[in-house]
Amino acid sequence: MENWQATEILPKIEAPLNIFNDIKTYTAEQLFDNLRIYFGDDPSRYNISFEALLGIYCNKIEWINFFTTPIAVAANVIRFNDVSRMTLGKVLFFIQLPRVATGNDVTAPKETTIMVAKHSEKHPINISFDLSAACLEHLENTFKNTVIDQILNINALHTVLRSLKNSADSLERGLIHAFMQTLLRKSPPQFIVLTMNENKVHNKQALSRVQRSNMFQSLKNRLLTSLFFLNRNNNSSYIYRILNDMMESVTESILNDTNNYTSKENIPLDGVLLGPIGSIQKLTNILSQYISTQVVSAPISYGHFIMGKENAVTAIAYRAIMADFTQFTVNAGTEQQDTNNKSEIFDKSRAYADLKLNTLKLGDKLVAFDHLHKVYKNTDVNDPLEQSLQLTFFFPLGIYIPTETGFSTMETRVKLNDTMENNLPTSVFFHNKDQVVQRIDFADILPSVCHPIVHDSTIVERLMKNEPLPTGHRFSQLCQLKITRENPTRILQTLYNLYESRQEVPKNTNVLKNELNVEDFYKPDNPTLPTERHPFFDLTYIQKNRATEVLCTPRIMIGNMPLPLAPISFHEARTNQMLEHAKTNSHNYDFTLKIVTESLTSGSYPELAYVIEILVHGNKHAFMILKQVISQCISYWFNMKHILLFCNSFEMIMLISNHMGDELIPGAAFAHYRNLVSLIRLVKRTISISNINEQLCGEPLVNFANALFDGRLFCPFVHTMPRNDTNAKITADDTPLTQNTVRVRNYEISDVQRMNLIDSSVVFTDNDRPSNENTILSKIFYFCVLPALSNNKACGAGVNVKELVLDLFYTEPFICPDDCFQENPISSDVLMSLIREAMGPGYTVANTSSIAKQLFKSLIYINENTKILEVEVSLDPAQRHGNSVHFQSLQHILYNGLCLISPITTLRRYYQPIPFHRFFSDPGICGTMNADIQVFLNTFPHYQRNDGGFPLPPPLALEFYNWQRTPFSVYSAFCPNSLLSIMTLAAMHSKLSPVAIAIQSKSKIHPGFAATLVRTDNFDVECLLYSSRAATSIILDDPTVTAEAKDIVTTYNFTQHLSFVDMGLGFSSTTATANLKRIKSDMGSKIQNLFSAFPIHAFTNTDINTWIRHHVGIEKPNPSEGEALNIITFGGINKNPPSILLHGQQAICEVILTPVTTNINFFKLPHNPRGRESCMMGTDPHNEEAARKALYDHTQTDSDTFAATTNPWASLPGSLGDILYNTAHREQLCYNPKTYSPNAQFFTESDILKTNKMMYKVINEYCMKSNSCLNSDSEIQYSCSEGTDSFVSRPCQFLQNALPLHCSSNQALLESRSKTGNTQISETHYCNYAIGETIPLQLIIESSI
């Protein structure tokens, strides 16, 4: 046994011609022989350390394998024995600049030498293995002659060799991995290198704002165009050009040794291109014509540092990779141990060996081309070139494109049915990663939109109060509103004080907003823009107690949204959706609408009709007494003047249609009255989009959907006290009315007490109250039909009943005995002229006297003088949430008043115009009947308008407390006199509450706002690395091996000390994200559930809370206090995940509420989803005050458009979007910390400033490194700036941009575009849109399936 050779024990290994394998085999044999020496029976041979043998063996195998890999092309290996003691090395290189000889008396350039300093980077690698005590015992025992002893010794040797082989392999991989990591740390992405090469600046030159912004934009464009370039197409020229750009963008190495890695044709390799196996295989297939296998000359030795006294490099020598083990054992422990000769198996003059490498011809240069798959195969370390990437996408839902601006850019004709789903889209379609069509509509986003936080203005109001008040001109525009409250009796007394003062009335913010068009609203010179922070609340400034305060009130209804955010045509489109949903029949009401419109706006109207209205005041018995008179008036005016009388009074219309079907009036006239009632009922049925029979909180569900059904909204004209089922506070004087203070009218009996109080403030009512049905119909008439057909050319009026009755009827023969009463004619000229005007001039005196006496008979049902009633009532339970719990809406209604459609002249002294509502405040009627108002209008002619611009008396001008606000009056003032306009006004009464939004969304009716959906997807990508030749020096020494003996095992630790030195003149390496390996998330349609993100919040009303949770799919009740505390502290996740996941990890789509008028072009390019850019390269982000102004100061134009924002509900500080997704507000919201928010990166101020500072630093540092060390600072170290890795892996966060997603508002458009592969171009098809993607992910996914 003592004479055995290594080849007799180890398995036979056939040594190929390749010399590297020869070295490996010979090294293994020598190691085994030396192990026998160490563990033999001769004690004199114990002079060799076992640890030293292991270190030498691993060192030799490690470096032989390194030199056989293509990555070694980028390395220059140098030995330095004291590298373990070196913490920071600084190597100086002297470089002589090339010169160009000149002539023509030009001074020749002088010889110039530059000293370049390069810093070393220490990076030790470690590995360890264990040998059991039993194994070591068998090794230490002397070899015996028995077969069992031989087998045990051989097995022990094999165990040692297996451990050594595994450790040596680990060091091989570790060396390559460490070198790869070093290359990556000094390899900026190609898009950065190309940008800096194009924008080179002097290293001492400070970047201007324009330069920095240009560089940033160039970085963004190059990043988006270079991502996944291997997947975009198979065009070899395109890919070849990108690879050539990678090679040309880097610099050469300081060391230009052309002996290493040279082909047989003496063509040196200029660099190496590395990538994961998938990318390399793709390149091999695409660029096969440029790829070949070359035999190159590879080094088998490494350099050796010789250090002088000055600690500077004075020479470089060469040393063999492997020393002879026999000579090492002889010299171990002596002075000659470091003077070993080269291995005996080599020719002493040979320092290179031939190696086959794949090469790629790029232009006139040759580069190595391979992957390192075998290095990382079956290990727990990922290939550094296989990286992760996060991209954030955004896309719109419910954006409105007006029909008047509609056009089609679709080349292929797409046919869509003429349905409102196609004319006002409420869905968005896109593909997930498996090419399955996904759809999101408003019903899907209810878990976000119907959360209690979204409908609570507490934080919005508080943050606005904490902000500085407007100053200068903006203060005078926004902060002049005063809220004036007076008791209703005093209102009538001071009604005209405003007009008598003849002073300009400041406009409130609502008026200012609605005077702007869509484009102007979003501009920075819009002073009201900072007050538009929430879609469901009006915010403004008011003067109170000589101080400026913030006022926040619910908008209550969709129609109260400013018209620039919800334009007229949009409301009409919503109405058409309701008509389609209700399947409203197309009964022709055009002729009726035409005659009613002409009657309301003709300007000629008999004053007797107003007297009759006062006498009847909705009383059936009074109507029956005057039935003959009324029929004669109607017949005359309809036949002679084609005017339909009493079309301004709902009560008269109902009485006529119910009691005059006996041919007392022309059939055509009666048909118009019946059509009017039918039309009103049609409107009611159309807007009843919910189940009327369903109850919620004890009320019909339809009350929560539309305000016209809500008993809290009162009819503006009433003659008897309406039902007060909602406990509204109704005030006629100083105190609210109660059941005890409201007196009952006693008709047909002596009612002297009421007659005495007819002109007092006491309120009388009838025993019979109007039914709920008639109340709803009357509100539809006065709030929809009358404004739409009269265009607000109507006015409220009060009548002094006492004086009118006394003057007209307290004369003979009315006060004479019955005999005289029947015989004597009427002597009142005024009354006779009124009757002739109403009946025509053909009536005799006897006939007119008879009519007058009939009028007199109806006085037993006379009502009282007109009063103004103030109605103060809270909102419905769904809107009574947060700050709105204490909100009380205000209405002023006319009690015993009437609606004038023409001025009264003859009886002017008895009638008083009362502009109490914007629908009923025609300045023409008011000015004609009141001299003070006329003078006021002459002084300020711009108030001669019907769109709400005519100022109401201050106690009646409570814009922010009223139900109908400026947008209603603006629409009704200019709308066409059509059924659609009536329906639109009714649809505008749809409520802005979570219940109403849920009802509308599930009925496929647009809820009045759009949404920006934001989703972050995760990708595994493959990168390419190009490094120039000898770009990095590796400084090494022999590994250090230590043994740690324990009871049953001995642990051997290998440590290889390495230092790396960059040898490039500039950036000598670069990377590019080339290939999409896999999509980790599903790219699907799962909506963020805010009930999980903010689990503690609940609606104030328990029934509402339960209903909402049920209808949006949140079945779990509110957590208990203990559960809530645990969620806030430790986070909580859904316990019931979907039972089946078909498409992988679900990506979350978050919802940002957005105005429907947001420009669709905003979604066609990368933008910040908050609506305003957040990357501030024009501002120094270290100046945080200036940075915050760039973020939030909307008096400054946005960096990307001429507008200040595209979504003030998200971009303004303290806006709804800011509160939901800015993590600074989470402490106030009880946030679930385990909820992921893709929007947080765009809203959190601290993160935005941090990434901007990082981006600012990245651009500045790369600009300093844009020149090589020959023409810039020689101390510059060309490594990646801090933040580069984060920039590459999360570009959307650093760019503060989300990317457009390929989507469309109609599935037909999506399918049409996918069929043609046209996914990167955005198109419009009338009211529909298709958004093109910036990165062609759709095509990439399709090509990979």
Swiss-Prot record:
GO terms for cellular component: host cell nucleus; T=16 icosahedral viral capsid. Belongs to the herpesviridae major capsid protein family. It is found in: Virion; Host nucleus. Homomultimer. Makes the hexons and eleven out of twelve pentons. Interacts with triplex proteins 1/TRX1 and 2/TRX2; adjacent capsomers are linked together in groups of three by triplexes, heterotrimeric complexes composed of one molecule of TRX1 and two molecules of TRX2. Interacts with scaffold protein; this interaction allows efficient MCP transport to the host nucleus. Interacts with capsid vertex component 2/CVC2. Interacts with the small capsomere-interacting protein/SCP. Its main location: virion. This is Major capsid protein. Pfam families: Herpes_MCP. HAMAP family: HSV_MCP. GO terms for molecular function: structural molecule activity. It comes from Human herpesvirus 6B (strain Z29) (HHV-6 variant B). Self-assembles to form an icosahedral capsid with a T=16 symmetry, about 200 nm in diameter, and consisting of 150 hexons and 12 pentons (total of 162 capsomers). Hexons form the edges and faces of the capsid and are each composed of six MCP molecules. In contrast, one penton is found at each of the 12 vertices. Eleven of the pentons are MCP pentamers, while the last vertex is occupied by the portal complex. Keywords: Capsid protein, Host nucleus, T=16 icosahedral capsid protein, Virion.
